[in-house]
Amino acid sequence: MKYLGLAYFTPEKFAAMSPDDVKALVSQCPALDEKMRATGKVLVSASLGDLDSWRTLRPRSGKTHVSDGPYTESKEVVGGLFIIDADSHEEGLRIAAMHPAATLGEEGGWAIELIPMDFYLAR
């Protein structure tokens, strides 16, 4: 079963962190990312660009309307994603728990949401 992992952060909390705290936090991420990759189950792993460069596309009167910024009502914003191919739900949870946002970053509002995928099309 394939699972989409969404890595969330809270921009206000993250912005309140000192540069040294951010650097210390981020410096721990590569080792955890590598631990996930070493399972051989990670198909995709990505961090997302600056929120100021996000665009939202919506259908409006038969045309596609583009607006600035993320479309979200939440204080938490998706900052990264991953897709894993797990043999079971338990394995999916175990692998997702290795992600930095599941183990670090409480002060930045980090969290992971793990979602079973019904459809997956790869190149």
Q: What residues fall within each predicted segment?
A:
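Conserved, structured core segments of small domains
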Residues: 1-123
